[in-house]
Amino acid sequence: MELASGTTLVAPQPKGILDPATGKPIGSNDAFFGEINNELADKGFLVTSTDELINWARTGSLMWMTFGLACCAVEMMQMSMPRYDAERFGFAPRASPRQSDVMIVAGTLTNKMAPALRKVYDQMPEPRYVISMGSCANGGGYYHYSYSVVRGCDRVVPVDIYVPGCPPTAEALLYGVLLLQKKIRRTGTIER
């Protein structure tokens, strides 16, 4: 996050039960906490809620695991190469599901591969997110009417972001990653 020079960081307004006499949250006029807050403000500290700090850390260090099943995986690999450099957004690849926050399902999901997808998804720690990449992962795509194809990976795992295209470009996938980061910032650490 880049700030213009000379701007002041301000913590969000405190939430809580409002005092009917003053219209401010209870405890906001407490002299002890007011003094501590003023001392910290003079020394250059930032006071914020833990929830916002955790969300900031989660969006800046997303580790993704590939589940490349078809040609979309080539575009997924291209996204992590120097031209697009997904790591500048804090989105780095990992090979193990136990170290991953995000799974990118790229390509045609067959009926035989569906249990493996679910098993890998179950091995990921909470909170975990899924990006469905391409027409085949979104809804079966070109092979929609085949007997052996799952018509969308959302029938096997919950999907957070859908990236359309056949295959979607690396820019489209990068935009999906940015949308996922925005979604994580909007939701709290407890709820999903």
From Swiss-Prot:
Catalytic activity field: a quinone + NADH + 5 H(+)(in) = a quinol + NAD(+) + 4 H(+)(out)
Cofactor: [4Fe-4S] cluster
Binding residues annotated for [4Fe-4S] cluster, in chain numbering: 71-72, 136, 166
InterPro entries in UniProt: NADH_UbQ_OxRdtase-like_20kDa (IPR006137), NADH_UQ_OxRdtase_20Kd_su (IPR006138)
Signal peptide: none
Its EC number(s): 7.1.1.-
EC class name: translocase
Record text on cofactor binding: Binds 1 [4Fe-4S] cluster.
Major localization listed first in the record, in broad terms: membrane
Protein keywords: 4Fe-4S, Cell inner membrane, Cell membrane, Iron, Iron-sulfur, Membrane, Metal-binding, NAD, Quinone, Translocase, Transport, Ubiquinone
Listed GO biological process terms: aerobic respiration; electron transport coupled proton transport
GO cellular component: plasma membrane; respiratory chain complex I
Entry's localization field: Cell inner membrane
Entry GO MF terms: 4 iron, 4 sulfur cluster binding; iron ion binding; NADH dehydrogenase (ubiquinone) activity; NADH:ubiquinone reductase (non-electrogenic) activity; quinone binding
Keyword Transport: yes
Topology of this chain in the membrane: Peripheral membrane protein
Alphabetical list of Pfam families matching this protein: Oxidored_q6
PROSITE patterns noted in UniProt: COMPLEX1_20K
Coiled-coil regions listed in the entry: none
Described function: NDH-1 shuttles electrons from NADH, via FMN and iron-sulfur (Fe-S) centers, to quinones in the respiratory chain. The immediate electron acceptor for the enzyme in this species is believed to be ubiquinone. Couples the redox reaction to proton translocation (for every two electrons transferred, four hydrogen ions are translocated across the cytoplasmic membrane), and thus conserves the redox energy in a proton gradient.
Subunit structure, interactors included: NDH-1 is composed of 14 different subunits. Subunits NuoB, C, D, E, F, and G constitute the peripheral sector of the complex.
Family from the record: Belongs to the complex I 20 kDa subunit family.
Protein name: NADH-quinone oxidoreductase subunit B 1
